[in-house]
A protein has these predicted regions:
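N-terminal helix-loop segment corresponding to the beta1-alpha1 unit
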Residues: 1-189, 223, 332, 347, ...
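Short, surface-exposed loop/helix-turn segments at secondary-structure junctions
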Residues: 46-50, 215-226, 319-333
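Short Gly/Pro-enriched turn/cap motifs at secondary-structure boundaries
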Residues: 59, 225-231, 237-238, 336-343, ...
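Short acidic-hydrophobic surface loop/beta-edge motif
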Residues: 60-62, 237-242, 328-334
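Oxidoreductase and adenylate-handling cofactor-binding alpha/beta cores
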Residues: 146, 172-193, 206, 210-218, ...
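A short glycine-threonine-serine/GTX helix/turn-capping micro-motif
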Residues: 160-171, 193-195, 226-227, 234-236, ...
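A glycine-rich dinucleotide-binding beta-alpha-beta segment and adjacent secondary-structure elements
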Residues: 302-355
Length: 378
């Protein structure tokens, strides 16, 4: 099947996250992505550890398959290089604070005057307008402001650090990609270009839809970690086995809960986790702690009760299930070493053949293609 974005040109002015992951997804679906970077050092991710022979692994994971142009956006030559590209580009992605692109002469109105069909995607923490539009922040701030971080629970009954970049990726990358694709369809149907205002803090709200229903609409006070999906019930929480490994018990439905209780031989009088949830959870914890995870894993798998032993990222990468589905079969070349590429949620039919090996362009590698001066050697 032909890659659906094979004729789409994307100009990428973003750094770190979430923009680079969004443009990576577009690239994987066939779009040509030109990444613009500072001439001196490139974007910040090029400087992050770990590295392979000086090449940042994190940068390569998020930026392979893109062209690199090192360009000082404040220089006199910048618009000479950019204007021909702006005239034919389909999508522009940026994640500066509001007003920065305007000062560079690259704001939406200026670009739209050059190309009325441009789909201009701005990704920020709090959006282009509002009292906090200019506020600095990172993922931790955005999930904190959205209310979802308050729903986690740690050993001291306080919110814990999130395990992943929920706002950056879930509130920034994914909404950006979805809305860019919607805008492309709308334009194809006779519409014009548009300015997409993606706010990571707003995109995070959907991750706790149930808290919106219970807390905002129903007006209930949701205690920290006290809801069904945040550890408030014995049948949906993490427990520790005798070897210290964690077991994820997700037996929400009654049939799964009873199957799990049978595995650990929980007495019938304790199986009603609604009546005395603390006592029930304590006994479940005691029983799971009596044996190592290797003992429980096959029993829980055989019972098919939504209970699994937590894996590390390295264990997950060699899991037979993911191997069978080819999740990690795409490869990257990082300074001559072939490594697994980051799995992305794009159907295989829409991507290039898995046998191709991706590579991140060196800083300014594509400057000659677009008439830009080569960057000075670092």
């Amino acid at each position: 099947m032909t890659q659906p974005l094979k004729d789409i040109l994307v100009l990428d002015f973003s750094t770190l996250l979430p923009g680079p992951m969004a443009t990576l997804m577009l690239s994987e679906a066939g779009a040509e992505v030109i990444k613009f970077e500072r001439p001196e050092t490139g974007e910040d991710a090029r400087l992050t550890e770990p590295t392979i022979d000086g090449e940042s692994i994190g940068f390569a994971v998020l930026n392979h398959g893109k062209r690199s142009v090192a360009l000082d956006l404040k220089s006199g030559e910048a618009m000479d290089i950019l204007r021909p590209l702006l005239e034919k580009a389909d999508v522009l992605v940026e994640q500066f604070r509001p007003g920065v692109m305007d000062r560079l002469g690259l704001g939406y109105e200026a670009v739209r005057a050059i190309n009325p069909g441009i789909i201009y995607c701005s990704i920020t923490g709090y959006g282009q307008t509002g009292p906090k539009a200019m506020a600095a922040g990172h993922d931790l701030n955005y999930v904190g402001d959205s209310g979802i971080l308050s729903l986690s629970r740690g050993p001291d009954e306080r919110p814990t650090m999130p395990f992943g970049l929920v706002a950056d990726i879930g509130g920034g990358t994914y909404p950006a990609v979805v809305n860019i694709l919607l805008a492309l369809i709308a334009r194809q149907q006779g519409g014009q270009g548009t300015h997409l205002d993606i706010a990571m803090s707003e995109g995070a709200f959907a991750f706790a839809y149930w808290a919106h229903a219970e807390g905002v609409i129903a007006g209930r006070e949701i205690e920290n970690g006290g809801a069904r999906l945040t550890g408030g019930q014995a049948r949906y929480r993490l427990y520790t086995a005798a070897d210290g490994r964690q077991i994820a018990v997700g037996a929400i439905e009654e049939k799964f809960w009873q199957a799990f209780c049978d595995v650990i031989d929980l007495p019938p009088d304790l199986r009603d986790d609604q009546r005395d949830p603390d006592t029930c959870a304590a006994e479940v914890a005691r029983r799971l702690a009596s044996q190592p995870s290797a003992y429980w894993a096959p029993l829980l798998a055989a019972a098919d009760c939504c209970c699994t032993v937590l894996k590390t990222p390295r264990e997950a990468a060699v899991d037979p299930h993911f191997t069978a589905r080819g999740v990690f079969e795409r490869k990257l070349d990082i300074s001559g070493r072939i490594v697994p590429a980051l799995p992305l949620p794009i159907a295989p039919d829409f991507r290039a053949p898995a046998g191709q090996t991706g590579r991140a362009a060196s800083l300014g590698e594509d400057n000659p293609r677009y008439g830009a001066k080569p960057p000075k050697p670092r």
